[in-house]
Amino acid sequence: MLKEWAIKQGILLKVAETIKSWIFFSQCNKKDDLLHKLDIGFRLDSLHTILQQEVLLQEDVELIELLDPSILSAGQSQQQENGHLPTLCSLATPNIWDLSMLFAFISLLVMLPTWWIVSSWLVWGVILFVYLVIRALRLWRTAKLQVTLKKYSVHLEDMATNSRAFTNLVRKALRLIQETEVISRGFTLVSAACPFNKAGQHPSQHLIGLRKAVYRTLRANFQAARLATLYMLKNYPLNSESDNVTNYICVVPFKELGLGLSEEQISEEEAHNFTDGFSLPALKVLFQLWVAQSSEFFRRLALLLSTTNSPPGPLLTPALLPHRILSDVTQGLPHAHSACLEELKRSYEFYRYFETQHQSVPQCLSKTQQKSRELNNVHTAVRSLQLHLKALLNEVIILEDELEKLVCTKETQELVSEAYPILEQKLKLIQPHVQASNNCWEEAISQVDKLLRRNTDKKGKPEIACENPHCTVVPLKQPTLHIADKDPIPEEQELEAYVDDIDIDSDFRKDDFYYLSQEDKERQKLEHEESKRVLQELKSVLGFKASEAERQKWKQLLFSDHAVLKSLSPVDPVEPISNSEPSMNSDMGKVSKNDTEEESSKSTTTDNEISRTEYLCENSLEGKNKDNSSNEVFRQGAEERMCYQCESEDEPQADGSGLTTAPPTPRDSLQPSIKQRLARLQLSPDFTFTAGLAAEVAARSLSFTTMQEQTFGDEEEEQIIEENKNKIEEK
């Protein structure tokens, strides 16, 4: 009996040891497998977040592709619904080892029926309970670890989102500062409005609170991202290629960067001195440093969290999971991002929306805006017409250059024929502007008709029909794109210089310059230099669309002697009479002196050479014309151009050739109604649209060539005109 008992006891001990070894082996394998899944899942989620949030610059993406191509493939892989991390359900699901242990336990109970006694139930129950408790504790630890990894993954996503939101908000704030500075300098969308010495406040004094907030937040975020990147380089080194210091901005000393970044605590006065009064260029430089440093931080973090840097299974412990690395690296960076974002958002919303949207509008002001709404619609339509015509003129000039090159080229016929599709494409590009211009003109006419009908209804007078046949309102076939005169985007503005390019010591201003005191001279010189510097600065900031070479080419094409004598269409020749336009030339401080030379040269040329000219006067000699219909066409074109000449009762109008000028016309007759002016914009059928448009722009203002401000009635211009008249009389 004792012998049998000893044999049974030995069998039970062997079975227990086998079960114990199976349990330990299964738990180790299961633990390693779970840790590996959590590690890889967190790394994939982190890489996917960094790449999807678009916080990396293009050069950093290219560098990542060079150093570790697996990052891009892992980040761009198809993400699961709940991410790459294993879910709690998958962690709680029993694996094959758990099922094997259950079957072994049941088999043992079946094989030993003699142990089915009451005393043995307590032993087997305690063993089963201990196993279940151990299994539940390990499952709880794994679930807690999974929740922690999920939380840090969300923190990383929030940090990347805040970084991108902060960058976009700084860009908007800089645009608001830039737009306010441009407007304060006297710029409008098309032409200058006031000179530099009347600009009011210094540019850095505008939105000073927003400028300070931008500087403080950029400086704090830049320093936090720089310290985090340096910490990663020092405590978590990678290979030599990834740790190459030439690829990092954070290793550049603070003193070389300037802008007060080397100081831990900086006063407002010191920041004012370091940034030249919180100027726009200094803020833009600091913004570029922040963008580069932020992208560098996320690039290094992506290299550190790459799946290739995951430790092997036996060496992987909960202390080596990547969420601990992320927590150690970032430290106070998420808090800095969120605090700076909130501070800048408050300042930006205050300056951007408080005075315009959140301030209550007085009732009288609202009534005034209600009354002028229809007039604003007319202004919007006319302004849209002007911008479409300007764009159309640019396209036509480019097309004309292409045609001149094709005409004068010595290439073969095959190469020339290849250019025909390009010409067709350019003509198709012109068509939308032509249609838009026509639609804007029709819209303006319809709006003016509404105003006239409303005005006549109020006064009780019959409506006066328009005598111009071109005033017929045509219903719009397609909606017209109107360009509203509000809240423009500074990068898309076309600016004209309010700074005179003439040197201050030139003959143009020498007389007035000598009458000034020494302090006034120095002040005027400083203002002149400052205004030139600001102009160049604004051109570089806003992106000046047309280069100087292109503007010079436009000037030669539009206003050269060849362009003046260029024929528009083959009609009967008319002997031109000098156009009295000193008001347009007054912007340049000059009066045309070559009228007599043009008169003599034109008298010797043939009729084919001077079939038509671009400049016509209202008092053309009717005796020299051969056809009455052509006279009407020319008189109509002259009247159209006279609409844009600036009449001044105080300035004497005289031409340079000494010819008799037309008698002064009453001001009321020279200023027709808005409807008649709009009607005259519709050119005669005898004019081609391109030629008529070029003539219209050329006759309208010569100040476009010099990019100067138009001023009327100045004493300086009257003096220059009188001096030129005296010189002509002496000759």
Curated annotation (Swiss-Prot):
It comes from Pongo abelii. This is Vezatin. Interacts with USH2A (via the cytoplasmic region); the interaction associates VEZT with the USH2 complex at the stereocilia base. Interacts with myosin MYO7A and the cadherin-catenins complex. One of its GO terms (molecular function) is myosin binding. Signal peptide: none annotated. It is a multi-pass membrane protein. Residues 570-671, 710-731 are annotated as: Disordered. The chain crosses the membrane at residues 91-111, 114-134. Keywords: Cell junction, Cell membrane, Cell projection, Coiled coil, Cytoplasmic vesicle, Membrane, Nucleus, Transmembrane, Transmembrane helix. Belongs to the vezatin family. Residues 590-601, 722-731 have a biased composition (Basic and acidic residues). Residues 382-414 form a coiled coil. Residues 712-721 have a biased composition (Acidic residues). It is found in: Cell membrane; Cell projection, Stereocilium membrane; Cell junction, Adherens junction; Nucleus. Its main location: membrane. GO terms for biological process: cell-cell adhesion. It comes from the Eukaryota. Plays a pivotal role in the establishment of adherens junctions and their maintenance in adult life. Required for morphogenesis of the preimplantation embryo, and for the implantation process. Residues 577-586, 658-671 have a biased composition (Polar residues). The keyword Coiled coil applies. GO terms for cellular component: acrosomal vesicle; adherens junction; nucleus; stereocilia ankle link complex; stereocilium membrane.
